[in-house]
Every structure is written in C-alpha cells, then in structure tokens.
C-alpha cells in the first residue's frame, strides 16, 4: 500500500469519529490497551497508536508477516492485514545533490539526509495460529484509588509545572508559564480533574523553553485550533498511560468544526498533530523519569 492511501484511510476514520462521536472522539480507541509489537516489545506511537486501536481485536499485540514467521507462527487463512506507517531517514546519494547541498558535500564530504514514509503490513495476535497472547488488562476506571491519585500526582510533580488554583476555567498561560486549575472540589470526579489537568500539561510542553510550539494563535483562529488538537491527542495518550478514563470537556465541542476543516483541507495536519502530541508525551516522560531518579538518588 502506498503512503498516500494509508494516510487517506486514517484521515477518513478520524473524521468519521469526529462526526459521529463529537468531542468524545478519542474515547473509543484510547480506552484500549496500548498496541505493542509482539517481538520487539516496543509500543506503537503517534498515528499508529490510534490506527491500530481502531480495530476490533481483543489482543493489543502486533507484528509483520516476517516477524511472526521468524518465530515459526502462521497467519490464519483469510486474515486481512492492517498497516502502520513509519518515517524513515536515509542519506542522499551524491548524484542526487543540487545547489547548496552539493556545495556542502564538496566542502565536507558529508551526505545530507532525507526523510520518507514507509507502510508496513501487520497482523494482530488474534490472527495467528497457535499464539497465546497475554490477557489484556484494561486498567482504565472512572474511579481512581488513593494509589492511582498518588501515582498521577507524582508524575505531574516530577514534570515540574507551576499550577495555580484559581478561577472556574482551566487554562495554560504561555506568557506567565503556569497552569490554572479550578479547585479540585468543583469537579464531579477525580477522573475529570486529572483528565483536564493532563490536557493543560500537554499545552505546558509547548512553551518556548521546552518544545517551542506556536501558541500565539487567538481564540477561534486556525493556529489556536492546531494547538488544541495537539493537546487533545496528547492528553488522550497521557490518560491511557496513567490509567485515567478520558472525560469530555464541554468547551471542546466548539473546536470540532475547525479540526475537521483543518484535517480535510491540509493533508499534513493530522500527522503533524499526532507527531507533536507524541513529542509532548515523550518530553513529559523524559523529564518526569529524570526528576524521579534525582529524588531516589
């Protein structure tokens, strides 16, 4: 399958979810256990995380035909492959170089890199003869235990954002670099509170001193909608990782039309939003782990 067709299929599915599920479009797929490669034990990321979660399989384990075959497993007859997309990097050949690239090569002898997308067919563990996948434990719950809350609080504290309890609307203030959250008691559940806080925490990663995303868009603008989509996807990823059920924010319904228009008209909008959301999650994991290790030391 060519990458254009693969991206078109993903875009169609997400637009369909936005139309049918509205502001709740992430819940149906983010509630599932995160997809993982059965052989490498690495989690699928970004768009692939979402795309593989759209399927109806019970197992969250996946692999290519070659990977399954390398372990002696066979695909069940009639099984239809799913796919994943990866951005790969290669060095250009010297005879492909032009202009400044050629000048640089003649001076340094270093070949520049180029990026391209590659599509791989994958099969779920449910489609494999004789393979017994570990039972998937859906850890998401509408009620958080004291231990759950302590773990989430520790993760957020290790990330290090400044959080102010004030007002009745949650937001992130990029100029002053703080997160404003209403009093926790004003939320119906702990789940709603932490789902909201993880959304604002994703915004927090965009500060110029961190990932430096464009957060200058005014309310209702296309740039504002882009940043909100990144935060929505990023918080969905974080909720899945922290075992928090994703809750719907009433104010997100107003972004839906902007998101659907943006995704429909710009072929790169969706992949860019998922990529930036994944980078935000990676950043938070990295600094929280680093600070947690400091505390132990």
Feature locations, PLM:
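N-terminal accessory/interface modules of nucleic-acid-binding and processing proteins
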Residues: 1-297
């Amino acid at each position: 399958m060519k990458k254009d067709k693969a991206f078109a299929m993903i875009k169609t599915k997400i637009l369909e979810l936005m139309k049918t599920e509205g502001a709740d479009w992430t819940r149906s797929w983010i509630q599932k256990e995160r997809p993982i490669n059965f052989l490498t034990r690495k989690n699928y990321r970004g768009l692939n995380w979402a795309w593989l979660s759209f399927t109806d399989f019970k197992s969250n384990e996946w692999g290519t035909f070659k990977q399954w075959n390398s372990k002696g497993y066979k695909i069940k007859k009639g099984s239809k492959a799913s796919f994943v997309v990866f951005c790969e990097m290669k060095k250009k050949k010297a005879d492909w170089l032009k202009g400044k690239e050629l000048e640089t090569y003649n001076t340094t002898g270093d070949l520049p890199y180029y990026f391209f997308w590659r599509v791989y067919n994958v099969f779920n563990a449910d489609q494999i003869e004789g393979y017994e996948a570990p039972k998937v434990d859906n850890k998401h719950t509408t009620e958080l235990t004291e231990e759950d809350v302590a773990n989430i609080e520790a993760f957020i504290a290790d990330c290090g954002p400044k959080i102010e309890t004030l007002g009745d609307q949650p937001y992130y203030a990029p100029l002053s670099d703080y997160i404003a959250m209403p009093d926790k008691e004003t939320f119906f559940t702990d789940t709603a509170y932490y789902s909201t806080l993880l959304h604002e925490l994703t915004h927090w990663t965009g500060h110029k001193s961190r990932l430096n995303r464009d957060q200058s868009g005014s309310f209702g603008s296309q740039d504002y909608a882009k940043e909100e989509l990144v935060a929505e996807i990023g918080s969905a990823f974080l909720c899945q990782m922290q075992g928090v059920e994703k809750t719907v924010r009433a104010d997100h319904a107003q972004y839906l039309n902007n998101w659907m228009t943006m995704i429909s008209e710009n072929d790169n909008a969706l992949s860019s939003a998922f990529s930036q959301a994944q980078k935000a999650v990676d950043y938070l994991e990295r600094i929280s782990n680093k600070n947690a290790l400091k505390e132990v030391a």
